Structure formats: structure tokens, C-alpha cells
Amino acid sequence: MTVTDVLKIDVAVIGAGPAGLMAAEVLAKGGARVTVFDAMPSAARKFLMAGRGGLNLTHSEPLPDFLARYGAAEARLVPAIASFTPGDLRAWSEALGQPTFIGSSGRVFPEAFKASPLLRAWLRLLSEQGVTFAFRHRWTGWNADGALKFETPDGPRLVAAKATVLALGGGSWAKLGSDAAWVDWLAAKGIAIAPLRPANVGFNVAWSDVFKDRFEGQPLKGIALSFGTQSIRGEAMITRSGIEGGAVYALSSALREVVMADGQVVLHIALRPDLSADELASKLAVPRGKQSFSNFLRKALHLSPVATGLLQEAAIAQGRQLAALPPDELGVLINAVPITLTGTAPMARAISTAGGIVFDEIDDAFMLKRLPGVFVAGEMLDWEAPTGGYLLQASFATGVAAGQGVLKYLGS
């Protein structure tokens, strides 16, 4: 095939992640002939990465609480998620031979825990349904005639599709495929796109050399993080450049907006959130004897070395000596350690992204109003959510909605 040849197909799905594969499944079940294109050598690279530590498919909390996790985008995502609910997602997984269970936190996982068995079963089903795959096909926009342009190992390729589903992801983990190159091509078509920003991301902190050399990679367990009126219990991890982890990610949206506007923001960490300031002061008032201060804190309050190191960092920043603080002041500090965040970690290290195609650019069928026949699903759209199964649920659900939208479009 020369570059002037155009391959004509029914439906092109661009992006072989959860949203794209789900759109392909819906389309194939509806009788459409589907080709899935992806720049990577194989499907769902980021999905597989997400499943390495346990594939959190969705969450079991009541649907109203679940939907509220999407914040400003809730109203626009309600129809899609109400049509493909967390219960529907669990039933879908079980139909693929991968039953699920609810963890202690309410999160839902496949019993196999990993993503690979589910993905293998899914790809096998899609192949049986007649879906074809074209890997190492990097989409580069449209030509003057509206044909899809791809760069492949064999050179440029043009594809004319009756309908297209774009499911190229956001801008996180670019090495796994979602590099956000699509932003420029859609912006050139007049599509309004909210700037992409890292979501569920760690933050930079100017740790002292002593602290980061000693405590890089150390967890802070059983803590509570607070910012404004929000407080989250969980864990965090000290990194060489700052702090990350589930509790940090839960507050990252609000923290990100302030740090991007003001250049810094203060996060407070409670190291012993189950104890009041008075209870802490009482325990700290016990004579220390000949113990080192760190040993005293370890025995009196079960503070880990990294927690004590964090207190030292805070005291030094205030120009004070930690061991010289009166029990009442130290008790207050232990449950309100101020950490100054100076920026987000790079988008490449973020779990997901905020921003994307604004919802006013699509109709109720997830079709771009300016580009009839072109539908969008997944993280390309302007929404964000915390970890806990909300990201995958919305990706799956918008994939279903886009697939259904294409079927209606082709049927009309």
C-alpha cells in the first residue's frame, strides 16, 4: 500500500486501553466491524501496569457517594456510569471468567488480583467477535480529506472510517502510550481543551540532605493528612524529591490547584491521629531519663524513625530544637506537622491527569459536535477522580457510552 492508498473500514477505535477496548466490544456486539489501532506493540499497557499491585476495578460504595467522587464532572458522567454501573462492571468481569471480591476498604478487585488474566480473556473475546487490531500504529491526526493518518513501521498509512472512537488517554505514563499528542491535533480542529494537569500525583518538598538520604523510600503509616476542611487517613511515602502515596493522592486535586497558582502550599500531617493533643502532652511529660530523644518518642508514642525525622525537619524549619519543645507544644506539632509543597511531581509520574476535552464539545452520545462521526471516551475528557476504582469505572463506562453512540450514529 502506498501513502496515497486509503484503507476503508467501518469503525476505527484509536487507543487499546480500557475505554477503547470497551467501545470495541460494544460495537462488535452491535454488529459493527471494528479495527482497534494503538501506537504500542500490544494492548492496554497502562492497564497492566495499574494491575501489578492489584487491579482495583471499581468501588462498592453506594452509587450516590460513588458519583460524588467525580466532583465538577459528576453531572456529565452520571448518564454513562448509571448505564454501566460498578455492579455491571463486576458482572462483566465475572462473565470473562474473572470473579471479583470486595476488599476491606470497599475497593473491588478480581480474585486473580492482577490485570493480565482479565486482559487475556477480554482480548480473546474481542478476537472471537471479529475485532481486528493494528498495533504500532501511531495516530497523527487527519489529512485534508478527513482520512485518519498513522505512522507505522512500514511508513505512513491512511484510513477512512465511517466512524471513529478516540480513546488515547490523558498525559500520564507517556512511555506506556498516553502521551497527549492528540491535544494539538484536536485543538487545530477548534476543539476546546482544558489544560492537562497531573492528578493523583506526589509533590515536591525541599527535604534536607540528611533527611532524604536517610528516609527516601520510607513509609509513614497510620497518619492523617489535612488541607483546608479535608482530612484523609492512610499512608504516604517519602521520596527523594518529596512525598507521595494514597493519602497524598486523595488530596492532590485541591493541593495541585493552590500550588500551581501560588507556587507552594502547606500540608499538615498528623502522626498519631488517634490521640488528642492533651493525651500526647501527657505521654510526653513522662521523664525521659537517659533515653535518646528518638528512643523516647518511639517508646512513648510508637513513632517510627521517619516520623521522628519529619518532626526534626519541621522544628529546624521553625528555627527550634525538637528536644527542647515543651510537651504541650510538641503534642500539637506531632498532629499538625507542616510540610511545604513546592510543586507537583512530573506528569509522567502521575497516576492520571486532569483536564482534557471539555464536555461542552461533545453531545449526549459522546460525539464531538464539531466533528460528526468522531466520538471520545476515557481520560481524554475533562474529568478527574481519586484512586479507588473511580478512574477505571469512568473509563469503562464512557467507552460503553461512546460505543453505543457510534451504533446509533451508524444506524441513522
Model region roles, listed by residue range:
Residues L77-T85, S105-R124, W173-S178, V205-S208, ...:
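Short beta-strand to alpha-helix junction loop
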Residues A28-R52:
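Glycine-rich FAD pyrophosphate-binding loop
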Residues D10-V36, A402-L407:
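N-terminal Rossmann-like FAD-binding beta1-loop-alpha1 element of flavoenzymes
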Residues A163-W207:
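Glycine-rich loop(s) and the adjacent beta-strand/alpha-helix scaffold that form part
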Residues S172-W185, K189, D382-G411:
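A conserved FAD-binding loop/helix module that cradles the flavin
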Residues K29-G30, S42, L63-D65, A82, ...:
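Residue-level recognition of phosphate/Mg2+-coordinating polar/acidic sites
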Residues F135-A147:
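A conserved short coil-to-beta-strand element within the FAD-binding core of flavoproteins
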